[in-house]
Amino acid sequence: MVGNEGRLIVLDAGSGMRALGANVEAAEQVDVLITHLHMDHIQGLPFFAPLHDPDVRVDVWGPISTTQTLSERLNRYLSPPLFPLRVRDLSNVVFHDVPPGTFEIDGIQVTADLVSHPGPTLGYRLEENGKVLTYLPDHEPALGMHNFPKNPEWTSGYGLASGADLLIHDSQYTDEEYSERVGWGHSSYSHLLAFAAMTGCRTLMTFHHDPDHSDQKLDEAHERLRATGPEFEIVAGTHGAVLDV
């Protein structure tokens, strides 16, 4: 996400960080918003080129913990023998422990809140000039196929996603797959549609696809999702996709 004056905001730090870092145009400031510290969301961080450039300030934001700071927790991965450098060796990096609440990045209002997923996990809502992007990549809005909440105020993530222009949301499981994985912290297709409809979002980008799903299976799934006739646009999250919010 590009903010004011080209300031870059990156949502999570998965394997795409290496390619992103190699193609980032000159920027003096990068902000990385981490939802949680599961490996698929942080494994690309040490390979992000701006992290090692003393002329670029990188602010890393992530969920607060009662036991260790964000930098201490990331240092368990960013240190030998898993990686040759330690967090303290990074040249111009600032870590922020994020509690539920609202803060500002270069005029963009960022709201963070805990969502339903194993371990401390944040969702993010970014607002600027009346436009809203909500990012909920790992999110189980209801437990069980028949327990979707009727009251929005009691639904995990609703406050972050309400009225979003772009909702980027977990879409890992088919309903059949989810029935055997209740409580794993990911969404079924039915819950995905119900949650998006509840929020009144304008565009839904499906995200966090199951790595065992082939491109053909994903294409077929998205045909079925669109065939339900939702009041919002459905866009499949793909590598290199560019959207205007």
Model features per residue range: what roles?
Residues M1-P137, A142-M145, G157-Y158, L218-V245:
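Binuclear metal-dependent hydrolase catalytic cores
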Residues E140-V235:
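Cap/insert and terminal regions of metallo-dependent hydrolase folds
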